């Protein structure tokens, strides 16, 4: 599969999903039910921060294997704060993880890009679903996260940014 890696055409190794799961989940609805009346009069301000990290997992070869497959845990962390007229509507924190392996060996930089660009793209639809269901279950309209450009986020990390992609959503229909 060809792709443009930060302006350079290259090959990205194929990732294999070994598992995915919610590692940490927190939702606070501190000012209910009065906040529901406030939202009907004034749209909430929603701030979203996203962070991606990866870690190598220690794996021992099974019997008969000469070397174990390299496994990596990729964490997609999303923090959301919704405020209406300076009153917190809700706070949401989610760490959603996936365990990945690469189908072939690759140089370290290419592996890093696969883990911090491709892998979070695989996890993101599940993160979006969890957040939409959670906000709806808390009595708010489902919050549908906008698509995230993980390649641009990775490029900003290389440029010395803190690695967080911050979005502001001020639409009244979102939550």
UniProtKB/Swiss-Prot annotation:
Any single GO BP term: protein tetramerization
Annotated signal sequence range: none
Keywords, sorted A to Z: Chaperone, Cytoplasm, Protein transport, Translocation, Transport
Database matches in SUPFAM superfamilies: SecB-like
Record Gene3D superfamilies: SecB-like
An annotated GO cellular component: cytoplasm
Family, as annotated: Belongs to the SecB family.
Entry function: One of the proteins required for the normal export of preproteins out of the cell cytoplasm. It is a molecular chaperone that binds to a subset of precursor proteins, maintaining them in a translocation-competent state. It also specifically binds to its receptor SecA.
Subunit (UniProt): Homotetramer, a dimer of dimers. One homotetramer interacts with 1 SecA dimer.
PANTHER family per the UniProt record, alphabetical: PROTEIN-EXPORT PROTEIN SECB, PTHR36918
Name of the featured protein: Protein-export protein SecB
Organism encoding this protein: Anaplasma marginale (strain Florida)
Lineage: Bacteria, Pseudomonadati, Pseudomonadota, Alphaproteobacteria, Rickettsiales
GN (gene name): secB
